[in-house]
Amino acid sequence: MMFCYQCEQTTRSPAGIGCTSEPGTCGKDEATAVLQDILTHLMKGIASMRAGRAMGVADRRTDDFIFYGLFTTLTNVNFTATRFVHLIQEASKRRERIKLLYEEAAREQGKTPEILSGPALFQPADSLEQLLRQAPSVAINADVEHLGSDVIGARALILYGMKGVALIAQHARVLGYQSDEVMPQAEEILDYLASNPTDLDEMLEESLEVGRLNLKVMELLDVANTDSFGAQEITSVRISPIQGKAILVSGHDLHDLKQILEQTKDQGINVYTHGEMLPANAYPLLKAYPHLAGNLGGAWQDQQREFADFPGPIVMTSNCIIEPGRSYKNRIFTLGPVGWPGVRHIDNGDFTPVIQAAKALPGFTADAKEQRITIGFGHHTLLGVADKIVDAVKHGDIRHFFLVGGCDGVSPARNYFTEVADNAPADSVVMTLGCGKYRFNKHEFGDIGGIPRLLDIGQCNDAHSAIRVAGALAEAFNCGVNDLPLSIMLSWFEQKATAIHLSLLALGIKGIKLGPTLPAYLTPTLVQKLQSRFDLDLDLIGEAQADLQAALAHTA
């Protein structure tokens, strides 16, 4: 039986928490859910051979595979069961190869190989039917009756954080950026999970290691994006269509977007970004393409309506895909780790089918009324005007900063974030990132002495920029980040948000408001431990005005 509770929208009922019947809330069927558990288990098995790295046993392709494989198991990434069967087979082969290399290196160096157990020895079956029979023994909640939900939840916190790390690392790796520090630490954490830990305090400390690793990975991706596409710059981006054939690119992968822009040059096709791809319009080497026409639509949960209305093909480069509607299923394409049964997948970097579809479809028949928003306030931009921001604070023009953003979702409780942003006083600045920004990024915020009151920092992955800016302000005021007139309100949905949140906790940042609901895997015991240590507030529903007043009172 399937069991999944990794996303914010997991089933919650009097009978219990977690999606236990198909389809899950995300649309995942039982086969896909349990195959993802098996693949994750095998990734731990590969990591269990980490002792070989010190003996010179390292395989970049296997390193890539670990991150790629974990990426496919995130919420709203891949729903194709047959694809997971192939990934499981590949994982098993890679694990055995690394095992042989490790044992050979140990013999050559006169060392005794470690005795392997658990995921390192698990043998996946050959057929889908047999794999489904094996799945219960490796499920996230395996043996919960004996271990208890606290232990399972603490393990889940680490695992889901690592899935988020894998996603961000994979985006950097496709741009050719890797770090000799990242993979050994990732293996260490996965190997720790493979040991089936049970000490709650120890596991919460290990979750902070996930956060520290994610800080390195986010910085690596920032360098990769900046080196590849230039530093984000303040940009007025069009958010209404113009006449012409069109392609819509959603997801997060800037490398994929660059390939599409390159292959559509001089083809008479306009390329639009969607969702978390919005910040692409602020990178100099991407916006230099004249046919990058702007951004259309909003956050991932609105895609079924927005994609149905779009008169051209759609390309999903990463999460978040949800079940394609009939009206556009034959004109949506997936790339890389993304997949949906019956949807065409491009795995060779050749976008000819997308281009052909764009030419065959009507496109936009007329220009819409021009609408624009301003983006591009990454840390390179903001640190360049840090002295101006500091002066505004010292002179009382800026009283408070709010960081409001993260993942969006369907829950009406997420209106909290709109209320906070819209009701923040005129002498405050709202920084935002992730697709949560779409709840208010088309609203008018004005400016303070030429400093825009709404600063769009970028994707969820660009939380690194927010951290850099907060650190620079703390240094300028000779205080800690927790002493700044800064309030952090984060919306979460999936595992990347978990990794980012763990990074903030690892930095010792307190008073974070997380919502709209409590992660299902955080039991009351775990919540109590987190709240006592990190001054966390996990109950946001209906408290926007009160939270604003409390934040401003603290500043005063």
Swiss-Prot record:
Its cofactor is [4Fe-4S] cluster; hybrid [4Fe-2O-2S] cluster. GO terms for cellular component: cytoplasm. SUPFAM superfamilies: Prismane protein-like (SSF56821). GO terms for biological process: response to hydrogen peroxide. Its main location: cytoplasm. Binds 1 [4Fe-4S] cluster. It catalyses: A + NH4(+) + H2O = hydroxylamine + AH2 + H(+). Transmembrane segments: none annotated. It is an enzyme of class 1 (oxidoreductase). The modification Cysteine persulfide is found at residue 407. [4Fe-4S] cluster binds at residues 4, 7, 19, 26. Keywords: 4Fe-4S, Cytoplasm, Iron, Iron-sulfur, Metal-binding, Oxidoreductase, Plasmid. It is found in: Cytoplasm. One of its GO terms (molecular function) is peroxidase activity. Hybrid [4Fe-2O-2S] cluster binds at residues 252, 276, 320, 407, 435, 460, 494, 496. Its EC number is 1.7.99.1. Belongs to the HCP family. PANTHER family: HYDROXYLAMINE REDUCTASE. Catalyzes the reduction of hydroxylamine to form NH(3) and H(2)O. This is Hydroxylamine reductase. It comes from Acidithiobacillus ferridurans.
